[in-house]
Amino acid sequence: MSGKRADGGHDGAGDVALIIAVKRLAAAKTRLAPVFSARTRESVVLAMLTDTLTAATRVPSLGSITVITPDEAAAAAAAGLGADVLADPTPEGHPDPLNNAIATAERAVSGSFTNIVALQGDLPALQSQELAEAVAAARAHRRSFVADRLATGTAALFAFGTRLDPRFGSDSSARHRSSGAIELTGAWPGLRCDVDTPTDLAAARRLGVGAATARAIAAH
């Protein structure tokens, strides 16, 4: 992504590269199965990615946005919003597919950017100002992170002039903290509200989800 978009969002002025890794939609968010059919779940996952990207494209400090995914629908949606897209080369059965995908994307953008953030793609209540404030706070540290609303996961991992060293997965908040990353303490409720379960989705809806997610849920 580069330059100014027609909707007024700013695409190329920043010095930070953002990475979002997205798994195959059919395999994503299986814990939402109690409330959505498989087809609707895929639509909701894609909508949450759309709302996350829409918020991110309005953050002036982001100079590029890259989505790495093996999923054609997710890739098309990301490209339609102006993101760069990488095909995820992670093989089936890889023991750590998410972190491998993030590391792959990091290598791809590191030639142009030394400041990188890995962001979850399931943040339908994300506000652009929240992400902008988190990026600004992260500049005070070489490596930092924002925990999710339950303080067990990681919503965003930042690296300024150093490697991301991503440790997403179970108890990633503790793993990032123990690896030396500084925990950022801003409120940022939408940034912290990733959606894995029906309870998470209810929390996001209370905050106010983006237009794409609202439409996907309404169609259910």
Curated annotation (Swiss-Prot):
Phosphoenolpyruvate binds at residues 154, 169, 172. InterPro entries: CofC, Nucleotide-diphossugar_trans. It is an enzyme of class 2 (transferase). Its EC number is 2.7.7.105. The keyword Nucleotide-binding applies. Pathway: Cofactor biosynthesis; coenzyme F420 biosynthesis. GO terms for biological process: F420-0 metabolic process. Keywords: GTP-binding, Nucleotide-binding, Nucleotidyltransferase, Transferase. It catalyses: phosphoenolpyruvate + GTP + H(+) = enolpyruvoyl-2-diphospho-5'-guanosine + diphosphate. GO terms for molecular function: GTP binding; phospholactate guanylyltransferase activity. The keyword Flavoprotein does not apply. Belongs to the CofC family. Guanylyltransferase that catalyzes the activation of phosphoenolpyruvate (PEP) as enolpyruvoyl-2-diphospho-5'-guanosine, via the condensation of PEP with GTP. It is involved in the biosynthesis of coenzyme F420, a hydride carrier cofactor. This is Phosphoenolpyruvate guanylyltransferase. It comes from Mycolicibacterium paratuberculosis (strain ATCC BAA-968 / K-10) (Mycobacterium paratuberculosis). The gene is fbiD.
